[in-house]
């Protein structure tokens, strides 16, 4: 019985044959297949159908957090009964530990962990250990070191009503699982004790588990809202998984401490023999402090650097990653594989180079080198069956694939966009005229440039000309980037200018024009693959058009234009043959940040005070600044447990965004 797909439409266009061929390939035992799908042909829908028919745990790898968020939201809609989870880096801000010998500069690791994303990571790993109908959408974080799935799964605590359980012993078990006791600031990964009642917020949950004792007997287990205390569900049994992925047994911890001490002694001898006395002293001081922390509390800052000892692995042995939480027969999709595959290849070398310097200068033991991402060869060994998904598959996918399935026809009958090449002379004025024509028709525009400076200058110029413009650049964090793209769709902005951020996987049906500046400058950003991907951003609109500003036609431009024309002719012939009239895509604007940034599910009965009321006469730029300021205040209020204030601020933000979206 296939898993249930929920969608207001059935597979059409090229989708049915793509699903049929790829499923047949999987059942025939093909290890490598490629879905060559043009932009807007519904590749995500096809992936959901394949998952539903194959009925195996599935990993969808994507190359950035924005795309992961988008895919996760779509799969959750298509597969309401399945466990659709997300696994990305939980750092909002991250500066890795590093040492620059030329400046004698040590950079300490600084990280700001996003609690909500950490919760989603735990939800993903726990789903994999408890059920089969699991689809995880992940970034390359999937190949970075994670705690052992065996320890994570075996160390869980089973609680059942009616069983006799020594409460004090249970509290010690929770502490062993890295839970913290906190009777005041009750949050995820903590527990509190009140009389005969024990409350726990598991690492994967937003709700609390209350365990009520009668003496040493568990009398009742309920799930409740930690803020209001409202009982949501009654349970006969629950399982509490560790609060952190890096967890180990007491026996393994003791063995690890002995092993770390032995490695330290050996390394100190090496450094002293080489006359590196400063490095030896530094390493000794840092490692002994960590060992003391491990002995006393079972945890230390940077514990992941000792993961080889904690896991009992041999030097150089493959580390545990998210891939090890999957069963052997799992299915993998690699979305936008032409970008994701090279990214997977490059992870190991960059990490190794940075850590080798730390080891050489006595900041870390050599075993820290084994806290690393997978080498590409190790990643390949984890693959049971994989489907590469891309509009422009790379040489690796083409060479490996036993079958390449084309998906060119769109269900809506939409054609690939028309392409026009225009001279660079007077390009900005020409572009401004095109933008104004699109704005009159309530359409959106993407503009891609080659340099950050040019993108900034162009965005500033367009703003001066009265165009609602936003500049999308690499310094913008994940959540804000998602919000900018959402606001483009809502009409807060009419134009978004970017460099390399307007390519793979951006689903923006309102965009009718993509302008490519300096299209004839050969290079990575203007290769045939990049150009085809950029062109695809205009393929979801019935009036989709691409303007390349160039003075010559490069080979990459020629290939991209020819391939787009080939697909366009196939699509036109299909439409004529079946009497299809192209239709625009009507797609709701999902709030991809709904579970990553929120204070409460429902709007509360909160009153906005006159001092904080929304000003209606501010210029648009000032309102956008105000929204940012209010969001900061909302976060601070939520952190300080001032939930009424946080919810009131949230309501103001919603009102401001609605006002911006409606105003012209």
Swiss-Prot record:
Residues 624-659 form the UVR domain. InterPro entries: Helicase/UvrB_N, Helicase_ATP-bd, Helicase_C-like, P-loop_NTPase, UVR_dom, UVR_dom_sf, UvrB, UvrB_inter. ATP binds at residues 37-44. A motif (Beta-hairpin) lies at residues 90-113. It comes from the Bacteria. One of its GO terms (biological process) is nucleotide-excision repair. Its main location: cytoplasm. GO terms for cellular component: cytoplasm; excinuclease repair complex. Residues 24-182 form the Helicase ATP-binding domain. It is found in: Cytoplasm. Residues 427-593 form the Helicase C-terminal domain. It holds the Pfam family Helicase_C. Keywords: ATP-binding, Cytoplasm, DNA damage, DNA excision, DNA repair, Excision nuclease, Helicase, Hydrolase, Nucleotide-binding, SOS response. GO terms for molecular function: ATP binding; ATP hydrolysis activity; DNA binding; excinuclease ABC activity; helicase activity. HAMAP family: UvrB. The beta-hairpin motif is involved in DNA binding. Forms a heterotetramer with UvrA during the search for lesions. Interacts with UvrC in an incision complex. Belongs to the UvrB family. The UvrABC repair system catalyzes the recognition and processing of DNA lesions. A damage recognition complex composed of 2 UvrA and 2 UvrB subunits scans DNA for abnormalities. Upon binding of the UvrA(2)B(2) complex to a putative damaged site, the DNA wraps around one UvrB monomer. DNA wrap is dependent on ATP binding by UvrB and probably causes local melting of the DNA helix, facilitating insertion of UvrB beta-hairpin between the DNA strands. Then UvrB probes one DNA strand for the presence of a lesion. This is UvrABC system protein B. It comes from Chloroflexus aggregans (strain MD-66 / DSM 9485).
């Amino acid at each position: 019985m296939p898993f249930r797909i929920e969608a207001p439409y059935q597979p059409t266009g090229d989708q049915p044959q793509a699903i049929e061929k790829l499923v047949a390939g999987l059942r025939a035992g093909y290890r490598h297949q490629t879905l060559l799908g043009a932009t807007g042909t519904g590749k995500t829908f096809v992936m959901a159908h394949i998952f539903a028919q194959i009925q195996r745990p599935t990993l969808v790898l994507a190359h950035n957090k924005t795309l992961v968020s988008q895919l996760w939201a779509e799969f959750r809609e298509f597969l309401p009964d399945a466990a659709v989870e997300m696994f990305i880096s939980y750092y909002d801000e991250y500066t890795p530990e590093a040492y620059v010998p030329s400046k004698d500069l040590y950079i300490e690791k600084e990280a700001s962990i996003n609690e909500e994303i950490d919760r989603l990571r735990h939800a993903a790993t726990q789903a994999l250990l408890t059920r089969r109908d699991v689809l995880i959408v992940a970034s390359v974080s999937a190949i970075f070191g994670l705690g052992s799935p065996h320890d994570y799964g075996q160390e869980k605590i089973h609680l059942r009503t009616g069983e006799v359980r020594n409460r004090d012993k249970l509290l010690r078990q929770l502490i062993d699982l890295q839970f913290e006791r906190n009777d005041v600031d009750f949050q995820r990964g903590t527990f509190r004790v009140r009389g005969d009642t024990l409350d726990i917020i598991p690492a994967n949950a937003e709700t609390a588990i209350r365990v009520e004792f009668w003496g040493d007997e568990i009398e009742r287990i309920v799930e409740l809202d930690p803020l209001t205390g409202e009982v949501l569900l009654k349970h006969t049994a629950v399982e509490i998984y560790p609060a952190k992925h890096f967890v180990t047994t007491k026996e393994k911890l003791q063995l690890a401490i002995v092993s770390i001490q032995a490695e330290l002694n050996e390394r100190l001898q090496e450094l002293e023999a080489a006359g590196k006395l400063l490095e030896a002293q530094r390493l000794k001081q840092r490692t002994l402090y960590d060992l003391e922390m491990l002995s006393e509390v079972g945890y230390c800052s940077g514990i992941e650097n000792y993961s080889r000892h904690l896991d009992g692995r041999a030097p150089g042995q493959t580390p545990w990653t998210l891939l090890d939480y999957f069963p052997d027969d799992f299915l993998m999709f690699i979305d936008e594989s032409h970008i994701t595959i090279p990214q997977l290849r490059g992870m190991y070398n960059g990490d190794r180079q940075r850590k080798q310097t730390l080891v050489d200068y006595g900041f870390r033991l050599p075993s820290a080198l084994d806290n690393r991402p997978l080498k590409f060869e190790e990643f390949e060994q984890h693959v049971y069956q994989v489907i590469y998904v891309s509009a422009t598959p790379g040489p690796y996918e083409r060479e490996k694939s036993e079958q390449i399935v084309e998906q060119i026809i769109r269900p809506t009958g939409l054609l690939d966009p028309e392409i026009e090449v225009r001279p660079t002379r007077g390009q900005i004025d020409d572009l401004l005229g095109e933008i104004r024509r699109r704005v009159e028709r309530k359409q959106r525009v993407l503009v891609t440039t080659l340099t950050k400076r040019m993108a900034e200058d162009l965005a500033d110029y367009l703003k001066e000309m009265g165009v609602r413009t936003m500049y999308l650049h690499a310094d913008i964090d994940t959540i804000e980037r998602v919000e900018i793209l959402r606001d483009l769709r809502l009409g807060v902005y009419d134009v978004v200018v970017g460099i390399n951020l307007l390519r793979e996987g951006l689903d923006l049906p309102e965009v009718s024009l993509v302008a490519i500046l300096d299209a004839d400058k050969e290079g990575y950003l203007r290769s045939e693959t990049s150009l085809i991907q950029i062109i695809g951003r205009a393929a979801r609109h019935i009036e989709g058009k691409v303007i390349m500003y160039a003075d010559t036609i490069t080979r990459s431009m020629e290939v991209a234009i020819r391939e787009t024309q080939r697909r366009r002719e196939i699509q036109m012939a299909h439409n004529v043959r079946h009497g299809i009239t192209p239709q625009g895509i009507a797609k709701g604007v999902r709030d991809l940040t709904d579970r990553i940034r929120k204070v409460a599910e429902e709007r509360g009965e909160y009153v906005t005070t006159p001092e904080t009321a929304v000003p209606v006469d501010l210029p648009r730029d000032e309102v956008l600044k105000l929204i940012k300021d209010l969001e900061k205040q909302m976060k601070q209020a939520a952190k300080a447990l001032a939930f009424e204030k946080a919810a009131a601020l949230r309501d103001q933000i919603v009102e401001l965004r609605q006002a911006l979206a409606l105003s012209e």
